[in-house]
């Protein structure tokens, strides 16, 4: 579990927030059940590195002036023009209580339908699960090797490979295999030998 040091914020002026960001830090808020919200600032590079190395659902220990709390990042705000992290939300978690999380899907295997020329469609890229913090995976592998042409894989077809449960609608589609699109020239049949194409009669 990564540990990040943070400083408590007491000045909320816009000019102060700009100074925080210009110094390479990001303002944030720590919140949770039965605790007082705590505005903080922390090193943005260290935060992004932790999330990149360990995944967005990793549990982080935040040390605010010696007071340590286990948290998860629930929201990151960025400035698209500057490509800069502007704010982060941290939820305090109870390691013995279940919580909900969104986990990225990783499709594995090559579907039989794709080998036959089909096209895979993936309308769902994250799964909603409920689990204790330590049991939340960083990705969930979904094997599609058995899917044939026109097959549809739904949440109901999945089996959890860890200590978590899916909270999505069971009928929600994860992936499907569609037949290949016919080329335009195949749809417009060529004239038979000896048959004059329409519009060329003199």
UniProtKB/Swiss-Prot annotation:
The keyword Nucleotide-binding does not apply. It holds the Pfam family Ribosomal_TL5_C. Keywords: Ribonucleoprotein, Ribosomal protein, RNA-binding, rRNA-binding. CDD domains: Ribosomal_L25_TL5_CTC (cd00495). It comes from the Bacteria. One of its GO terms (biological process) is translation. Residues 180-202 are annotated as: Disordered. Residues 185-202 have a biased composition (Acidic residues). One of its GO terms (cellular component) is cytosolic large ribosomal subunit. GO terms for molecular function: 5S rRNA binding; structural constituent of ribosome. Part of the 50S ribosomal subunit; part of the 5S rRNA/L5/L18/L25 subcomplex. Contacts the 5S rRNA. Binds to the 5S rRNA independently of L5 and L18. Belongs to the bacterial ribosomal protein bL25 family. CTC subfamily. This is one of the proteins that binds to the 5S RNA in the ribosome where it forms part of the central protuberance. This is Large ribosomal subunit protein bL25. It comes from Bacillus velezensis (strain DSM 23117 / BGSC 10A6 / LMG 26770 / FZB42).
């Amino acid at each position: 579990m990564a540990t990040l040091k943070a400083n408590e914020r007491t000045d909320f002026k816009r000019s102060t927030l700009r100074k925080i960001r210009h110094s390479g830090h990001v303002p944030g808020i720590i919140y949770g059940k039965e605790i007082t919200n705590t505005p903080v600032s922390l090193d943005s590079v260290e935060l992004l590195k932790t999330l990149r190395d360990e995944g967005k659902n990793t549990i982080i220990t935040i040390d605010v002036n010696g007071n340590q709390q286990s948290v998860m990042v629930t929201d990151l705000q960025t400035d698209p023009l500057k490509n800069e992290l502007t704010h982060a939300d941290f939820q305090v978690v109870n390691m013995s209580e279940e919580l909900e999380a969104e986990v990225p899907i990783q499709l594995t295997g090559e579907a039989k339908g794709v080998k036959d020329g089909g096209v895979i469609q993936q309308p769902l890229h994250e799964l909603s699960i409920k689990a204790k913090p330590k049991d939340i995976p960083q990705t969930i592998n979904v094997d599609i090797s058995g899917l044939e042409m026109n097959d549809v894989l739904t949440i109901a077809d999945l089996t959890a490979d860890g200590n978590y449960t899916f909270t999505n609608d069971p009928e929600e589609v994860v992936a499907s295999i569609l037949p290949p699109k016919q080329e335009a020239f195949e749809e417009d049949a060529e004239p038979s030998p000896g048959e004059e194409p329409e519009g060329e009669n003199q």
